[in-house]
Amino acid sequence: MGISNFASICSRTPLPLCSVIKSTTHLVLSNSTKIHDFDPQHLNIGILPKCYARSIDIANTTIFGIGNAFINIAALGVILIILYNIRQKYTAIGRSEYLYFFQLTLLLIIFTLIVNCGVSPPGSNSFPYFVAVQIGLAGACCWTLLINGFLGFNLWEDGTTKSMLLVRGFSLCGFMANFLASILTFRTWIENHEIPNTNTTALFVVVYLWNLINLFIFVICQLFVSFFIVRNLWVTGAVLLGVFFFVAGQILTYGFSSQICEGVKHYLDGLFFGSICNIFTLMMVYKTWDITTDDDLEFSVSIDKNGDVLYN
C-alpha cells in the first residue's frame, strides 16, 4: 500500500474520507470487477469499496450503515456513564484531564454519526468539512491521551490551570494538524470534482503514523506506571486488554471488512465490529485510570439534598 494513495484501503473499507478522494489505480464495479488504470475524471464519486453495509429508508430518509449507527449510539451512552463516574471521583489524580478526554470522545462519536449515517450525505458541499472535523477530533483525542499518559509521573500538578492549558493546548494542536491535513487533501475535491487523483501522503502521515506514535507512547507510559509506580498487575491487564481491542478493531476494519460484508450479505461491514472494539478500548482507558486512582480518596465525599458537596 502506497501512502500517497488510499486505493487499497478504500477498496476494502468504506471510510468516510474515501468519498472525497480519488485514485487512478482501480475502480471496483458492482459485480466486484476491478478496472486498473482507468480515467475517473468525469466521475463525481470518490474511491468505491468492494462491499459496504446496505442503507435503509425510514420516512423518506436514507440512513447509511444502520448497524454501525446503533453501535455508536450505544457508545454515546457508555461515554455518558464514564463521564458520570469520573465526576464522582472528586480527588482522583487526572480527574479533570480524563474528563476532558472523554468529552472529546463524546464529540467525536457525534460527528462520526453525522458522516457515517448520512446526516451530511456524501456528495454534499458540507460533507468534506464534516469528515475533516471528525478526523481532527480523532487526532485531538490521540494528542490528549499523549499528555494524559504522563500524569502518573507527577511531572506537574494535575487539575490546575497550567495542566488544563497544557492538555487543551495539545488537543488543539492535534485537532488543527489533523483537520488541516484533511481539508488541504480534500481541497482539490472541493474545488473540482473532476480531478483524476488525490495525493494523500500528508493525510496518511499525520492521521495514521503520527497519531499511532502518540497512542504508542501513551501505552508505554501506562505500562511503566503499572509496573514501577502503582505496581498493580490489574492495571497492566487493563492496558493490554485495551491494546488487544484496539488492534483487533483495526484489523477487522481495515483487513476483513469486505469479507465480513460479503459473509453477512451486506447487512454489516468491518466498521460495525471496529466500532465495538473502539468502545471496549475506551472502556479499558477509563478502567486503567480508575484502578490507578482507586486509593486517592483519603476521606469520604457525599452530596446532600441541596446538591452541596460534603467532605467527612
Curated annotation (Swiss-Prot):
InterPro entries, A to Z: Chs7
Any one GO molecular-function label of the UniProt entry: unfolded protein binding
Residues that span the membrane, as ranges: 63-83, 99-119, 127-147, 164-184, 201-221, 233-253, 266-286
A GO biological process held by the record: cell wall organization
UniProt entry tagged with the keyword Cytoplasm: no
Function: Chaperone required for the export of the chitin synthase CHS3 from the endoplasmic reticulum.
Protein name: Chitin synthase export chaperone
Organism of this sequence: Candida glabrata (strain ATCC 2001 / BCRC 20586 / JCM 3761 / NBRC 0622 / NRRL Y-65 / CBS 138)
